[in-house]
């Protein structure tokens, strides 16, 4: 019926589909493909999950944020931040072209690194900390940067507790995990695949598991 797309293929898969839903077209990033009689239509349910989590955790849009990454997931995060009312923030990306493009699209500032940035909300939208990767054991932000922040958001879903999340919890920070993103967006994927929306009890069980 379809498939899910994860980092780093959220943009690379776009030429392979027949149609982009409005969400995927606006963000230019895909995480869900639905096959209807051979017609491949792409969607982005990451945005829904990120926006909902920002609201659920009551993350104030007055906070200054740093968003590390400029790929497909970072695009969904940046769009959700803008729609939630965040006006001050930095897109931190090694790739100058994609970093500047994303920052300018939403009215934020691009930086190649975090030097000199003081942010209250730190978001990782890169594979740093992802299981099986070259940077699986690394922090996507320094300990000093985490110490100064109040909210830490890591979109990496595996492992459920990344090095960044582990350190942030040890420091008593508010943390939002990639597992939570995965659980919420997976419900939206399920709806797209089946036309059926799971009841709230089932979702709460899945969300509770994602926070373990």
What is each PLM-predicted segment?
Residues 83-88, 170-174:
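Conserved S-adenosyl-L-methionine
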Residues 58-64, 147-148:
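Short helix-loop-beta connector
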Residues 106-175:
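Rossmann-like adenosine-cofactor binding region
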Residues 5-12, 72-73, 127-130, 158:
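Short glycine-rich anion-binding loops that position phosphate/pyrophosphate groups of nucleotides
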Residues 1-57:
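Phosphate/diphosphate ligand-binding glycine-rich loop within oxidoreductases
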Residues 44, 61-82, 86, 93:
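Glycine-rich adenosine-cofactor-binding loop
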Residues 84-106:
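NAD(P)-binding Rossmann-fold cofactor-contacting core
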Residues 155-212:
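Adenosine-phosphate binding glycine-rich loop
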